[in-house]
Amino acid sequence: RLSNIKLGDTVVFVNKDAEQHWPASDIHPTHGVYPEKGGCIGSKFDACKGLKEGKQYSFTFFHKGSWCYHDHLKPNLVGCVDAQ
C-alpha cells in the first residue's frame, strides 16, 4: 500500500489483528533504508517490537522520498509511504 503524505506528517500504524506485527523500514532484517539512524536495529523508522492487537506505533517522516516498510515478524507484509 502506498500512502502519500507531506514532510513532517506522522503516520500511525495500528494493529487490528490478533497476531503481533512489527512495522519497520526496509530492508529485512536490517531496517536500514530510512536515512535517520537511532532505532533498535538500523533506522529510526522501527517499532522495535511486535505490537499486540489494538496497540499502535507512530512515526514522523522528515526525509523526502518513497519509504517502504515491512512487518519484521511477517516480512511478506509490506507497504510504502511517499513523503513529499
Stretch-by-stretch model annotation:
Residues R1-Q84:
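Extracytoplasmic copper-binding redox domains, predominantly the cupredoxin/blue-copper superfamily
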